[in-house]
Swiss-Prot record:
PROSITE patterns according to UniProt: 4FE4S_FER_1, 4FE4S_FER_2
Coiled coil start-end: none
Organism ancestry: Bacteria, Pseudomonadati, Pseudomonadota, Betaproteobacteria, Burkholderiales
Biological processes annotated in GO: queuosine biosynthetic process; tRNA modification
E.C. no: 1.17.99.6
Domain 4Fe-4S ferredoxin-type: 232-261
Residues binding [4Fe-4S] cluster 2, per UniProt: 251, 267, 294, 297
Name recorded for this polypeptide: Epoxyqueuosine reductase
Gene name of this polypeptide: queG
Main location: cytoplasm
Length: 409
């Protein structure tokens, strides 16, 4: 906890400036506080703030089965904490409520778009699809093209926590931003922030799914919001995904093995970010030119026609990551990678895995259908790969993937 989790519960004394201690707030005061928290959240740019209790018992069986099947791959931290992920009060002692927040991350310019030769503006999702279809393009997931979201989200959530403290005095709390074993989608759904889509991401009617989630675990018994009706099956009354299965069909590697179930071991986001070693050879051709993460399941989702622009400039594209080529990024030195990825979520995978991912993309470019790339582009790719292979400092991991890529030369 950022502060003693027992303090606000055990201490019934008013604060020195006359504010009531959190444990002394009556129902009306708690309701007013919840309303203010949501207003403060809007001021901080959050698209939605919701409050839930800590009962996630309905998620425990599914979590246990998913872990038992090994679908978490090398993400051992998911199994390490066991059922604490589904038991907020065990993860952070004293927790009574969870505040869930949603922050849009699409760069503002993305939704505006650039006019084509005829002056028409293409839907931004069509532009993203066009880059994925270009064998020479390096595709970085939209969320990772700007500043590291962990920092942006954490700072805003901490500011929100400080506003609460200024209102009621010291209270037990802890901020989470995809940095601990938290079932954030279940918590957000329970708090009425959205519903779990078949791709397992949270969806919201007026915002789609291109947003981050963050939480504040608190020891204050705020009134809980009504849960968003889950889409458990197409025939469920009020279902929000209905019979749509576009995300399942769009997944390049078939990682969405069933509605609401992802096998991370096949997911491109896992393979390019979480996996430390060699990417399984049968999956490499399916990755295409996606070098950090994957947005395919979101791009085809009908709800994302309502995706919102980020309220902050932190997520604006840096270093041309929305238009860079595979060769361009592959030729970065280790020093250039460290310098340019400073403050980016990409930096955490390190230079070695960055090159590994790019080598796979270059190999897939060489394997593109006839006419996919011209002879000059092909020659440039081969030259870049061979230059890396000639580097005596190249790691065994990178060398393996470069050699695989060159087998298509």
């Amino acid at each position: 906890m950022d502060r003693n989790p027992e303090l606000a519960i055990a201490d019934a004394r008013p604060s020195q400036d006359g504010r009531a201690a959190p444990s002394r707030l009556d129902d009306a005061q708690l309701a007013e506080l919840a309303s203010r928290i949501k207003a403060w959240g809007r001021e901080l740019g959050f698209g939605a703030i919701g409050i839930s209790d800590t009962d996630l018992s309905e998620a425990e069986a599914g979590l246990a089965a998913w872990l038992e099947a090994g679908c978490h791959g090398e993400m051992d931290y998911m199994a390490k904490h066991g059922m604490k992920r589904a038991r907020p009060a065990e993860l952070v002692a004293g927790t009574r409520r969870v505040i869930s927040a949603r922050l849009a991350y699409l760069p503002a310019g993305t939704l505006d778009g650039a006019p084509d030769a005829q002056g028409a503006r293409r839907d931004w999702r069509a532009r993203e699809a066009a880059r994925i279809a270009d064998p020479q393009a390096a595709v970085v997931s939209v969320y990772a093209r700007g500043r590291d979201y962990h920092k942006v989200l954490r700072n805003r959530l901490q500011t929100l926590a400080e506003r609460i403290e200024a209102e009621i005095g010291a209270f037990g709390h802890r901020v989470f931003t995809d940095s601990a074993p938290v079932l954030e989608v279940e918590l957000a759904q329970k708090a009425g922030v959205g519903w779990r889509g078949k791709h397992t991401l949270l969806l919201q009617r007026d915002a789609g799914s291109f947003f981050f989630l963050g939480e504040i675990y608190v020891d204050v018994p705020l009134p809980a919001d009504a849960q968003t009706s889950p889409d458990a099956a197409p025939e469920t009354p009020g279902a929000h995904c209905g019979s749509c299965t576009r995300c399942l069909g769009a997944c390049p590697t078939g990682a969405i093995v069933a509605p609401y179930r992802v096998d991370a071991r096949r997911c491109i986001s896992y393979l390019t970010i979480e996996l430390h070693g060699s990417i399984p050879e049968p999956l490499r051709p399916l990755i295409g030119n996606r070098v950090y993460g994957c947005d395919d399941c979101q791009l085809v989702c009908p709800w994302n026609k309502f995706a919102q622009a980020a309220p902050v400039a932190d997520f604006d594209v840096r270093h041309g990551l929305d238009r860079a080529s595979l060769v361009e990024l592959f030729e970065w030195t280790a020093e250039q990678f460290d310098e340019r990825m400073q403050g980016s979520a990409i930096r955490r995978i390190g230079y070695e895995r960055w090159l590994r991912n790019l080598a796979v993309g270059l190999g897939n470019a060489l394997r593109a259908a006839p006419g996919g790339i011209g002879p000059d582009a092909r020659a440039a790719i081969v030259a870049a790969l061979r230059a890396r292979l000639d580097d005596p400092c190249v790691s065994a991991l990178v060398r393996e993937h470069v050699e695989w890529a060159l087998r298509a030369a």
